[in-house]
Amino acid sequence: AVGDFNGDGKVDVYLTAVGGNHLFKNLGGGKFEEVTAAAGVGGGPGDWGTSAAFVDIDNDGDLDLFVCHYVKWSREIDFEVGYKLVGVGRAYGQPTNFEGAHPALYRNEGNGTFADISEAAGVRVKNPNTGVPTAKSLGVAPVDLDEDGWIDLIVANDTVPNFVFHNQRNGT
């Protein structure tokens, strides 16, 4: 994702990855500084970030951050299952064999840091019967679906229904 999260007029970069994500502040002149830890948007070592979007979810003029996470995966889990292809050897398992992972919504605090408001915003969708995360998010599209001036989010999932998060006009 790209966006000016700190309002300095320079486009910053957020990269998603397996095992943690990375926020790079644009210093100008083609130089970037990693500020992930200081900003509080790295996620955990077991996260599998797949995409992200900078979006002003609370209409306060600064860019908040929505991050898609795919499944709860690790090398240890994958090796434990021991997937193999005949004649080839090592393989990776189907996504249906892994528990989903919650996406994250971070509110920009306006001082270079973000607060995780995922729970309050209702983006941590759980299976009502098991309590496990339902999402296996691959992509997010910010759009004002109802033309009320507040950005809503459409999230594309793998092997489970997609999500539409309607902005409640209160930061959630």
Regions found by a protein language model. Name each.
Residues 1-172:
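Acidic, glycine/proline-rich Ca2+-coordinating loop motifs
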